[in-house]
Amino acid sequence: AKAELNTLFCSPIAWLILIIFAFQAGLTFSDLISDQLRYLALNYRPYNLTSALLLGYSGVYSSMQDNLYLYIPLLTMGLMSKEYSSGSIKLLYSSPITNIQIILGKYISMLVYALILVAILFAYFIYSACIVENFDFPFALTGILGIFLLVCAYAARGLFMSTLTAYQVVAAVGTLTVLAILNFMGNIGQDIDFVRDLTYWLSLAGRSDKFLHGMICSEDAFYFIIVVVLFLSLSVLKLKFERTTANSLSKMVQYIGVLCVTLLVGYVTSQPKLMCYYDATATKANTLTPPSQEVMTKLDGGLTLTMFVNLLDDNFNKGMPKNRNWEMRKFEDYIRFKPEMKMEYVYYYDHTDNPRLYAQFSGLSDKEIAQRLCDTYDLDFNMFLSPEDIKKVTDSKGINLEEEGNRFVYLFERENGQKAFLRIYDDNQRDPRESEITAALKTMVVKSPQVAFITGHGERDIYKGGERDYSAFAKNLTFRYSLINQGFGVSVLDLKADSMATDIADNIDFIVIADVREAYTPDVIAKIQRFIARGGNMIIACEPRRQPLMNPLVENLGITFMPGIVVEETEGY
């Protein structure tokens, strides 16, 4: 290793890479500092500076990570290639050292060089710690660890490629090619179950991003270790086969054996039940909030997440096999606390509210449209259940997808039979966030707060979508912030028609009285007062000039709506 380091630093390439690396890092960091000073001059309040300067989307660590693949092949291309081209490989073979010692010596020299690169980045760590108040040390150190592991993985790949050829340029190009293939690997065969899992694990893309986000996951840490051991083992085998006589079958068996062991270890370490996590951020930004964690601890027993994917819905592509790994990543934080959670998919076609699609295929039946879409997207039509078949499936589960508009929807099912829908929304983000996911799960472990909207006296309607009405606020399935999507149960209560009942039902937690247009009778007011007296909650909204109608409802609470309207005059209006 020492001799290799001496040789490495006798080459101008090693020094040139260090200079360019330091220059790029310094240029990036100075730009980031300038941006923060500019924000301060504009009286903006800086926040999360540890991430902004070092680990964010444009932070110095993130920027330099994106350039590493350009540097490492230039360093590794001569590790073994120069031995072949100069003939010194014969001296190595004749010396009293083993193949493992040769490869480890070469690799350790690259580890030392990697530490030098990391030391350059560590200088910005120290400077940031001096100028940033409440600097997040574990967060920043985790990012440095991720970059170091990435360099180690690149170096192992480069070393293996250099054992394959005596031409350094070919070794460098080969290393770049392998890195490109491994980065693209995650997009290969995503429609096939076994191939999807295999290529997704082999993919290098995004492996160090979690470290830059402050999360250490055992799966990613083991990935780097396994990949390093894999390519070092392949390098040792390559030297072994050059020094000994072995037939092609024997070589192939040994290479395949190393690959199989690697994949087996990778499969085991990627199992959710065996994965460990450490969130290094001070705010635990990569971890579910404590209320969400509390909900997950109460979800004892099995839990299944089923995705119902309607081919005729605009969002059907989210549930296609090629996107399953992406869908799993959405629920990764929940799988961390519920590793036995299963994910299932049900594909079907049925009529839904999709005017654009029906206008495009005017005059065709739902089945014909589904067949056209399968031909267009190269899908197997037989994987989609017919409306009759999906009806049998939903009936067996005790759910009704027609009430959901036959849209793309998630269904959580507990082992004890409890169920909860989770929806996607008609906004820019579409996917549910933690608040919506936890709200859906919470309905299965605690009683949902029940909100009753009082009707019968001209109040605002939760079934109408006008400006005056409360559809979006209360029951709109596609609006993220509607009560029904935030874990509330919503109903209407006509106290005028319900004159026979003596009291409001005990399961009601809130009543909403909005913009009454007809006076309440004494009996109705008495019901409301008894509801409040037993601990019920009331939300009341009064429009101007409705004070005489609303005051009888609140006078017993010591509240009175005053006559008139408060107006603040604005110049020019």
How would you name each of these model-derived features?
Residues 32-55, 171-244:
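Terminal transmembrane helical anchor/hairpin motif
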Residues 27-30, 48-65, 105-166:
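Secretory targeting signals
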Residues 72-76, 124, 156-157, 235, ...:
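Hydrophobic/aromatic residues in alpha-helical transmembrane segments
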Residues 37, 191, 209-212, 218, ...:
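Short, surface-exposed patches at the edges or C-terminal ends of soluble domains, predominantly
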Residues 1-71, 75, 237-244:
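Hydrophobic alpha-helical transmembrane segments
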Residues 73-93, 107:
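Transmembrane helix boundary and interhelical loop/hinge segments in multi-pass membrane proteins
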Residues 13-23, 168-183:
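Pore- or pathway-lining transmembrane helices of multi-pass membrane proteins that form conduits
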